[in-house]
């Protein structure tokens, strides 16, 4: 079944019941008439272990440029939301990223709860999960507990779930379609409301993952590409697969002209434009 269906159809498929508070928040996040999501992640943190990225050294300035581009939502860590979001409160739906982790398990911490997200006025609660490997049970347990608590506050849970491979004994992200499909199924069975998984690089394979999921699938924006055109082309393929949109971080604020970058991704996600047409439309 396609996950890009209008929300009432998704509710019917999944049993027809959803609390009003959660429905209101999901409708704000997926508020565009396309039914898809173009969101921006501003949550580059210690897990990347590569210092402060130039595009996020001044978070309020970055937010100002991003908001001008009119994304459908912005994802932030709880501390930055408390200190930098007031100026933009109500302008764009806020999603609180709660997790701080590293792929090799050298860090795993929850910085926020669903209640924290509600108190900050957020419309979504994001939580990261790593599957495959000896510690996947621990991540799944944290997600399951968050889903239970989120139900009390009627806030949707957006699970950022990433499969790992251990070729050569070193943990790396896996982009194999079967691993991504497994990750998506894990998230669905844990009861989350939206699943964010990496794009596997193949439209047909990703379309199968989307079709198999009873929950909306959105794509992760992925590592920074060589140029903006490459990132836009990848997201264009995501749209072709039938996914419900994407969340982009480094490929928005990692290049110059941040506001125009957001508009270009919006054109691809909401208007179905090619990378070339989106670049022309936004003057990039």
Predicted region positions:
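Thr-Gly-centered strand-to-loop micro-motif
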Residues: 220-221, 248
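N-terminal amphipathic alpha-helix/helix-capping segment at the start of soluble metabolic enzymes
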Residues: 10-43, 82-91, 281-282
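Short acidic/histidine-rich active-site segments
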Residues: 244-253
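C-terminal helical cap(s) of enzyme catalytic domains, especially alpha/beta-barrels
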Residues: 239, 254-284
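Alpha/beta enzyme core
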Residues: 39, 44-46, 51-74, 80-89, ...
């Amino acid at each position: 079944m396609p996950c890009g269906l209008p929300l009432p159809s998704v509710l019917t498929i999944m049993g027809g019941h959803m609390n009003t508070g959660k429905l209101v928040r999901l409708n704000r996040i997926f508020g565009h008439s396309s039914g898809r999501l173009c969101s921006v992640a501003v949550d580059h943190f210690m897990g990347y272990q590569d210092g402060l990225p130039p595009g996020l050294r001044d978070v309020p300035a970055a937010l100002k440029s991003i908001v001008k581009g009119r994304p459908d939502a912005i994802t932030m860590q709880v501390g930055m939301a408390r200190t930098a979001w007031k100026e933009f409160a109500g302008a764009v739906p806020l999603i609180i990223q709660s997790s701080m982790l590293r792929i090799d398990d050298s860090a795993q911490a929850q910085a926020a709860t669903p209640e924290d997200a509600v108190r900050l006025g957020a419309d979504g609660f994001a939580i990261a999960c790593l599957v495959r490997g000896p510690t996947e049970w621990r991540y799944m347990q944290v997600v399951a507990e968050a889903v239970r608590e989120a139900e009390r506050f009627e806030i949707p849970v957006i699970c950022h779930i990433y499969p790992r491979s251990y070729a050569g004994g070193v943990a790396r992200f896996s982009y194999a379609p079967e691993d991504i499909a497994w990750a998506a199924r894990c998230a669905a069975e844990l009861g989350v409301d939206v699943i964010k998984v990496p794009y596997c690089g193949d439209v047909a394979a990703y379309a199968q993952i989307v079709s198999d999921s009873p929950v909306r699938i959105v794509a992760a924006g992925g590592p920074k590409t060589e140029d903006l055109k490459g990132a836009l082309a990848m997201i264009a393929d995501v749209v072709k697969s039938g996914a419900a949109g994407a969340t982009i971080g480094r490929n928005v604020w990692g290049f110059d002209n941040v506001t125009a970058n957001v508009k270009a991704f919006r054109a691809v996600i909401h208007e179905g434009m090619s990378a070339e047409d989106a670049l022309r439309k936004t003057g990039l």
